[in-house]
């Protein structure tokens, strides 16, 4: 009996180790600016997202830039997104450029819901915010994110990969539906 129990514990340890490797070993390293470039630069963290509702709403998407004119305003857009049969740019974030020429722009929840998920916000009977999904999200693919400053018209671009919902995302969204936080129509 003890030998069989040890075998199960050993197998559990191996499976746990493999799972931890997949979770932590496959994560990409934090993005850094290229020291060789003197002009405007843009990076995004994470550089890949999935379109699961629950996962996307909890995950911060941060655009960082440097090499812009201090005191300027910067707007970050996703280029070439198919919407209504046409390709168009969608606004995701904005920020003020600091005195060092850098900025940090987080994508707000409303932009994630309306632009990336193409969903709506509403309220449930408890007056809690809910996400109402009635259309498919933007198509999966690798897009270009562009930061443009308003006064100086400086520009910088970075790739931004958007993937469809994973199996884990689907499970989280199903649980969100059971909790009344995600409504699919």
Where are these regions (language model features)?
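Sec-dependent bacterial lipoprotein signal peptides
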Residues: 1-26
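Extracytoplasmic/secretory-pathway segments with low complexity and glycosylation-like composition
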Residues: 26-185
């Amino acid at each position: 009996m003890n030998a069989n129990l040890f075998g199960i514990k050993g197998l559990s340890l191996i499976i746990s180790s493999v799972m931890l490797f997949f979770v932590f070993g496959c994560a990409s390293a934090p993005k850094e600016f290229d020291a060789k470039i003197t002009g405007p630069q843009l990076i995004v963290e994470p550089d890949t997202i999935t379109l699961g509702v629950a996962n996307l709403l909890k995950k911060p998407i941060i655009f960082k830039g440097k090499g812009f004119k201090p005191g300027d305003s910067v707007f970050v857009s996703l280029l070439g997104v198919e919407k209504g049969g046409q390709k168009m740019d969608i606004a995701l974030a904005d920020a003020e450029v600091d005195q060092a020429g850098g900025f940090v722009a987080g994508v707000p929840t409303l932009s994630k819901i309306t632009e990336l998920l193409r969903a709506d916000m509403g309220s449930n009977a408890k007056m809690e915010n809910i996400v109402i999904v009635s259309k498919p999200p933007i198509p999966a693919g690798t897009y270009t994110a562009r930061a443009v400053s308003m006064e100086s018209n400086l520009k910088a671009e970075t790739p931004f990969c958007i993937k469809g919902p994973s199996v884990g995302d689907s499970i989280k969204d199903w649980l969100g539906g059971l909790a009344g936080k995600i409504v699919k129509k």
